[in-house]
């Protein structure tokens, strides 16, 4: 319905959707919503290996392969690494680039610098694995799109109608402060945004004469606001590595139990390929199938 709405799909979940319900996508993200920011913050690749999570399971090539199989196409689509539970540190960006991603989606914590006027949210970061483009969400518009008020004092933003009115007013203000400047601003919806809310926002944005709705490719190709080999991140949203480590240890223990069971009790009924398939990634694919079958997800 809204051609300007850009959908970035998790290819694992995308392939489980019935073909007649799959949305048109602007690109795919890392499979299984793998948390690259937590991976870099934990800085323990062996912990992931012990848990049965290989780098090859979530790189850009695998994302493209899963999408191509689901769509029965040889035409590649764009790949984006989506921000996880923490911030995009230089280490996280380097890992994403090494995994084949040339662009990442970041929330407003990516750049801690405060500027007087709004600017294009495109950054280029030089990493040891190569340059990577960061598409940063604009803070106020993103907060409102996520269904949140911009401050505790903004009582008028307690309802969807109030937040939508503020969103339009805010975007008009940005246009008036620099009427002849072209700036590319990113706004995303949260994972629990309802279809009704998304429809309201997109309908209003499409009717706003002062806005020109473009796409992620256009933003990625825009002149970057900053080109640097450093990241000026806001650490207030740092990844909780303790939870990640606990989860990995649990996965590792479960994987050992499963493999032990497969090799000792079920040895006659399984070959080596069957045993190697008993890992968290296989479980993730089953989870994707289960999740995709639920109808209450917007």
Regions found by a protein language model. Name each.
Residues 1-21:
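Active-site beta->alpha N-cap acidic-glycine motif
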Residues 18-22, 92-95:
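Short acidic, glycine/serine/threonine-rich loops at helix termini
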Residues 24-53, 101-112:
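Acidic, His- and aromatic-enriched active-site or binding-groove loops in soluble protein domains
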Residues 48-78:
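Intrinsically disordered, low-complexity acidic Ser/Thr-rich regulatory segments
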Residues 63-73, 86-105, 109-110, 130-298:
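Catalytic grooves of carbohydrate-active enzymes
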Residues 81:
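Conserved, mostly hydrophobic/aromatic
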Residues 105, 121-128:
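General marker for long, soluble alpha-helical cores
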Residues 112-120:
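Short, charged, surface-exposed secondary-structure boundary motifs
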């Amino acid at each position: 319905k809204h051609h300007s709405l850009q959908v970035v799909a998790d290819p694992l979940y995308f392939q489980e959707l019935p073909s007649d319900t799959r949305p048109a996508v602007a690109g795919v993200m890392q499979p299984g919503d793998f948390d690259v920011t937590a991976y870099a913050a934990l800085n323990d690749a062996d912990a992931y290996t012990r848990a049965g999570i290989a780098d090859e399971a979530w790189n850009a090539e695998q994302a493209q392969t899963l999408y191509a199989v689901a769509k029965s196409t040889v035409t590649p689509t764009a790949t984006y690494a989506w921000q996880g539970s923490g911030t995009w540190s230089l280490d996280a960006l380097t890992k994403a680039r090494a995994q084949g991603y040339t662009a990442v989606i970041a929330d407003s914590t990516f750049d801690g610098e405060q500027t007087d006027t709004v600017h294009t949210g495109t950054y280029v970061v030089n990493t040891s694995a190569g340059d990577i483009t960061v598409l940063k969400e604009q803070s106020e518009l993103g907060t409102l799109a996520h269904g949140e008020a911009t401050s505790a004092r903004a009582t008028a933003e307690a309802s969807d109608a109030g937040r939508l009115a503020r969103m339009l007013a805010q975007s008009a203000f940005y246009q008036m402060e620099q009427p002849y400047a072209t700036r590319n601003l990113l706004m995303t919806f949260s994972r629990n945004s309802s279809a009704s809310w998304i429809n309201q926002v997109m309908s209003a944005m499409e009717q706003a004469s002062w806005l020109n709705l473009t796409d992620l490719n256009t933003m990625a190709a825009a002149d970057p606001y900053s080109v640097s080999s450093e990241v000026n991140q806001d650490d207030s949203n740092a990844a909780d590595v303790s939870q990640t480590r606990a989860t990995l240890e649990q996965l590792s223990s479960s994987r050992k139990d499963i493999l032990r069971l497969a090799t000792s009790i079920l040895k006659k009924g399984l070959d080596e390929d069957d045993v190697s398939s008993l890992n968290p990634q296989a479980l993730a694919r089953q989870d994707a199938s289960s999740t995709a079958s639920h109808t209450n997800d917007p």
